[in-house]
Regions:
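Non-catalytic C-terminal accessory region of glycerolipid acyltransferases
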Residues: 2-5, 9-12, 16, 111-237
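Short hydrophobic helices that act as membrane-entry/anchoring signals
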Residues: 3-33, 91, 95-96
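Helix-to-loop junction immediately C-terminal to a conserved catalytic motif
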Residues: 22-59
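A generic structural signal for well-ordered alpha-helical segments
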Residues: 30, 72, 94-95, 119, ...
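Glycine-rich, highly charged phosphate/nucleotide-binding loops
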Residues: 34-38, 107-113
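A structural micro-motif
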Residues: 35, 75-77, 98, 124, ...
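Residue-level detector of flexible, active-site-proximal loop/helix-junction positions
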Residues: 42-44, 84-86, 107, 165-167, ...
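Catalytic core of membrane glycerolipid acyltransferases/transacylases, capturing the structured
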Residues: 47-107
Protein backbone atom coordinates (compact mmCIF):
# COMPACT_ATOMS: atom_id res chain seq x y z
CA UNK A 1 0.00 0.00 0.00
CA UNK A 2 2.82 2.38 0.90
CA UNK A 3 4.63 1.59 -2.34
CA UNK A 4 1.48 2.23 -4.41
CA UNK A 5 0.93 5.55 -2.66
CA UNK A 6 4.55 6.51 -3.22
CA UNK A 7 4.34 5.59 -6.91
CA UNK A 8 1.13 7.61 -7.25
CA UNK A 9 2.85 10.75 -6.01
CA UNK A 10 5.92 10.08 -8.18
CA UNK A 11 3.72 9.74 -11.27
CA UNK A 12 1.78 12.85 -10.30
CA UNK A 13 5.01 14.79 -9.85
CA UNK A 14 6.24 13.88 -13.32
CA UNK A 15 2.89 14.69 -14.90
CA UNK A 16 3.02 18.16 -13.36
CA UNK A 17 6.64 18.63 -14.45
CA UNK A 18 5.85 17.61 -18.03
CA UNK A 19 2.79 19.87 -18.13
CA UNK A 20 4.92 22.78 -16.95
CA UNK A 21 7.57 22.00 -19.59
CA UNK A 22 5.04 21.65 -22.43
CA UNK A 23 3.11 24.82 -21.68
CA UNK A 24 6.24 26.74 -20.73
CA UNK A 25 8.01 25.90 -23.99
CA UNK A 26 4.88 26.57 -26.04
CA UNK A 27 4.36 29.95 -24.42
CA UNK A 28 8.00 30.87 -24.98
CA UNK A 29 7.89 29.96 -28.68
CA UNK A 30 4.60 31.72 -29.37
CA UNK A 31 5.43 34.87 -27.41
CA UNK A 32 9.07 35.44 -28.35
CA UNK A 33 9.08 34.20 -31.98
CA UNK A 34 5.46 35.11 -32.82
CA UNK A 35 5.11 32.55 -35.63
CA UNK A 36 3.12 33.65 -38.65
CA UNK A 37 1.41 30.88 -40.60
CA UNK A 38 0.32 31.41 -44.18
CA UNK A 39 -2.18 28.89 -45.53
CA UNK A 40 -1.86 28.66 -49.30
CA UNK A 41 -4.63 26.17 -50.06
CA UNK A 42 -8.38 26.04 -49.61
CA UNK A 43 -8.67 22.82 -47.61
CA UNK A 44 -6.59 23.74 -44.57
CA UNK A 45 -7.07 27.22 -43.12
CA UNK A 46 -6.00 26.64 -39.53
CA UNK A 47 -4.10 24.18 -37.36
CA UNK A 48 -7.42 22.64 -36.28
CA UNK A 49 -7.28 19.87 -38.87
CA UNK A 50 -10.54 18.21 -39.85
CA UNK A 51 -8.85 14.84 -40.34
CA UNK A 52 -5.56 13.23 -39.26
CA UNK A 53 -2.67 13.95 -41.62
CA UNK A 54 1.00 13.21 -42.07
CA UNK A 55 2.63 16.58 -41.40
CA UNK A 56 6.10 17.08 -42.93
CA UNK A 57 8.53 20.00 -42.82
CA UNK A 58 12.12 21.00 -43.47
CA UNK A 59 14.56 20.70 -40.58
CA UNK A 60 16.71 23.81 -40.25
CA UNK A 61 16.78 24.23 -36.48
CA UNK A 62 16.45 22.09 -33.36
CA UNK A 63 13.50 24.31 -32.52
CA UNK A 64 11.52 23.20 -35.59
CA UNK A 65 9.94 20.12 -33.94
CA UNK A 66 8.98 22.16 -30.88
CA UNK A 67 7.48 24.92 -33.02
CA UNK A 68 5.41 22.56 -35.16
CA UNK A 69 4.09 20.83 -32.05
CA UNK A 70 3.33 24.19 -30.44
CA UNK A 71 1.26 25.19 -33.47
CA UNK A 72 -0.45 21.83 -34.09
CA UNK A 73 -1.02 21.47 -30.38
CA UNK A 74 -3.92 19.03 -30.24
CA UNK A 75 -4.35 15.48 -31.55
CA UNK A 76 -0.82 14.95 -32.83
CA UNK A 77 2.14 12.66 -32.37
CA UNK A 78 5.70 13.12 -33.55
CA UNK A 79 8.34 10.74 -34.88
CA UNK A 80 11.61 11.21 -32.97
CA UNK A 81 14.99 9.60 -33.58
CA UNK A 82 15.53 6.75 -31.15
CA UNK A 83 19.06 7.93 -30.33
CA UNK A 84 17.63 11.32 -29.33
CA UNK A 85 15.12 9.63 -27.04
CA UNK A 86 17.92 7.63 -25.41
CA UNK A 87 20.13 10.71 -25.00
CA UNK A 88 20.29 11.41 -21.24
CA UNK A 89 19.79 15.13 -21.92
CA UNK A 90 16.31 14.44 -23.36
CA UNK A 91 15.31 10.93 -22.24
CA UNK A 92 13.85 12.07 -18.90
CA UNK A 93 11.12 13.88 -20.84
CA UNK A 94 10.85 12.11 -24.20
CA UNK A 95 10.37 8.68 -22.65
CA UNK A 96 7.44 10.01 -20.65
CA UNK A 97 5.60 11.75 -23.48
CA UNK A 98 2.92 9.44 -24.87
CA UNK A 99 2.85 11.22 -28.23
CA UNK A 100 6.50 10.42 -29.09
CA UNK A 101 7.08 7.70 -31.70
CA UNK A 102 10.66 6.35 -31.60
CA UNK A 103 12.37 5.61 -34.92
CA UNK A 104 15.81 4.05 -35.45
CA UNK A 105 17.30 6.23 -38.18
CA UNK A 106 20.47 4.16 -38.54
CA UNK A 107 18.93 0.70 -39.01
CA UNK A 108 15.94 -0.82 -40.78
CA UNK A 109 12.97 0.00 -38.57
CA UNK A 110 9.32 -0.68 -39.36
CA UNK A 111 7.90 -0.64 -35.84
CA UNK A 112 7.57 3.15 -35.85
CA UNK A 113 5.28 2.94 -38.90
CA UNK A 114 2.97 0.50 -37.11
CA UNK A 115 2.76 2.85 -34.12
CA UNK A 116 2.21 5.85 -36.40
CA UNK A 117 -0.56 4.00 -38.24
CA UNK A 118 -2.35 3.37 -34.94
CA UNK A 119 -2.02 7.05 -34.06
CA UNK A 120 -3.64 8.03 -37.36
CA UNK A 121 -6.42 5.53 -36.75
CA UNK A 122 -7.03 7.16 -33.35
CA UNK A 123 -7.44 10.52 -35.09
CA UNK A 124 -4.01 11.93 -34.33
CA UNK A 125 -1.88 13.56 -37.01
CA UNK A 126 1.74 12.41 -37.23
CA UNK A 127 4.56 14.95 -37.52
CA UNK A 128 7.65 13.79 -39.42
CA UNK A 129 10.83 15.58 -40.45
CA UNK A 130 11.83 13.44 -43.47
CA UNK A 131 15.42 14.72 -43.57
CA UNK A 132 16.06 12.94 -40.28
CA UNK A 133 18.45 15.63 -39.06
CA UNK A 134 19.06 19.37 -39.20
CA UNK A 135 20.82 20.96 -42.13
CA UNK A 136 22.30 24.41 -41.60
CA UNK A 137 23.71 25.40 -45.01
CA UNK A 138 20.37 26.34 -46.55
CA UNK A 139 19.83 23.19 -48.64
CA UNK A 140 17.66 20.17 -47.84
CA UNK A 141 18.87 16.66 -47.17
CA UNK A 142 17.35 13.69 -48.92
CA UNK A 143 13.82 12.91 -47.75
CA UNK A 144 13.58 9.41 -46.31
CA UNK A 145 10.66 7.50 -47.79
CA UNK A 146 9.04 6.52 -44.48
CA UNK A 147 6.51 9.37 -44.50
CA UNK A 148 5.45 8.50 -48.05
CA UNK A 149 5.04 4.83 -47.13
CA UNK A 150 2.93 5.78 -44.12
CA UNK A 151 0.73 8.14 -46.14
CA UNK A 152 0.28 5.68 -49.00
CA UNK A 153 -0.50 2.71 -46.77
CA UNK A 154 -3.03 4.59 -44.62
CA UNK A 155 -4.53 7.01 -47.13
CA UNK A 156 -3.76 9.94 -44.81
CA UNK A 157 -3.06 13.19 -46.70
CA UNK A 158 0.42 14.73 -46.56
CA UNK A 159 0.44 18.30 -45.26
CA UNK A 160 3.64 20.10 -46.30
CA UNK A 161 5.14 22.95 -44.27
CA UNK A 162 7.97 25.28 -45.17
CA UNK A 163 9.69 26.90 -42.17
CA UNK A 164 12.12 29.79 -42.53
CA UNK A 165 14.10 28.40 -39.59
CA UNK A 166 14.84 31.84 -38.15
CA UNK A 167 14.31 32.00 -34.40
CA UNK A 168 15.31 35.47 -33.27
CA UNK A 169 13.56 37.84 -30.93
CA UNK A 170 12.14 40.62 -33.06
CA UNK A 171 11.64 38.35 -36.07
CA UNK A 172 8.37 36.54 -36.73
CA UNK A 173 9.13 32.95 -37.68
CA UNK A 174 7.42 32.31 -41.02
CA UNK A 175 5.65 29.03 -41.82
CA UNK A 176 4.04 28.30 -45.18
CA UNK A 177 1.34 25.62 -45.26
CA UNK A 178 0.33 24.09 -48.59
CA UNK A 179 -2.69 22.13 -49.73
CA UNK A 180 -2.66 18.52 -48.44
CA UNK A 181 -2.08 15.77 -50.99
CA UNK A 182 -2.64 12.03 -50.93
CA UNK A 183 -0.21 9.40 -52.19
CA UNK A 184 -1.83 6.57 -54.10
CA UNK A 185 -0.38 3.39 -55.52
CA UNK A 186 0.50 3.42 -59.22
CA UNK A 187 0.23 0.19 -61.18
CA UNK A 188 3.31 -0.82 -63.14
CA UNK A 189 5.76 1.11 -60.98
CA UNK A 190 7.75 -0.79 -58.32
CA UNK A 191 6.84 0.28 -54.79
CA UNK A 192 10.35 1.43 -53.84
CA UNK A 193 10.70 3.52 -57.00
CA UNK A 194 7.29 5.10 -56.53
CA UNK A 195 8.03 6.01 -52.91
CA UNK A 196 11.39 7.50 -53.89
CA UNK A 197 9.73 9.59 -56.61
CA UNK A 198 7.02 10.83 -54.24
CA UNK A 199 9.58 11.64 -51.57
CA UNK A 200 11.60 13.76 -53.99
CA UNK A 201 8.41 15.44 -55.19
CA UNK A 202 7.54 16.48 -51.64
CA UNK A 203 11.15 17.47 -50.98
CA UNK A 204 10.97 19.95 -53.84
CA UNK A 205 7.57 21.12 -52.64
CA UNK A 206 8.83 21.78 -49.11
CA UNK A 207 11.84 23.57 -50.59
CA UNK A 208 9.57 25.95 -52.50
CA UNK A 209 7.54 26.56 -49.35
CA UNK A 210 10.69 27.29 -47.38
CA UNK A 211 11.85 29.77 -50.04
CA UNK A 212 8.50 31.52 -49.86
CA UNK A 213 8.81 31.66 -46.08
CA UNK A 214 12.22 33.30 -46.52
CA UNK A 215 10.92 35.63 -49.22
CA UNK A 216 13.39 34.15 -51.70
CA UNK A 217 11.78 32.84 -54.85
CA UNK A 218 13.52 31.21 -57.79
CA UNK A 219 16.30 29.29 -56.03
CA UNK A 220 16.68 25.76 -57.40
CA UNK A 221 17.29 22.73 -55.20
CA UNK A 222 19.28 19.92 -56.86
CA UNK A 223 17.71 16.47 -56.69
CA UNK A 224 18.86 14.39 -53.74
CA UNK A 225 21.45 12.47 -55.75
CA UNK A 226 23.08 15.73 -56.87
CA UNK A 227 22.84 17.63 -53.58
CA UNK A 228 26.29 17.89 -51.98
CA UNK A 229 26.84 16.70 -48.44
CA UNK A 230 26.79 19.44 -45.85
CA UNK A 231 30.23 20.51 -44.67
CA UNK A 232 30.14 20.66 -40.89
CA UNK A 233 32.75 22.65 -39.00
CA UNK A 234 34.89 20.57 -36.63
CA UNK A 235 33.69 22.48 -33.57
CA UNK A 236 30.07 21.60 -34.43
CA UNK A 237 30.63 17.88 -34.90
Amino acid sequence: MIEKTKQFFVDLFWKLVLLAVVYGVRTYLLVFYRPKMTFLGNTVKSTALKQPMVIIANHTSMLDPLMVQALFFHNRSIVVAKDQIEDPHFSWALKRFKNVIPCDRFNLDTEWALIAKKELEKGNSVIIFPEGKCRYDGLLNEFKTGFAFLARSTGAPVLSLGIDGIYKIGHRTQIMVDEPETIERVKGIPSSKHLAERSEYFRQKVWELKQRALGQMGAILPVSAETPEEIIAEENK
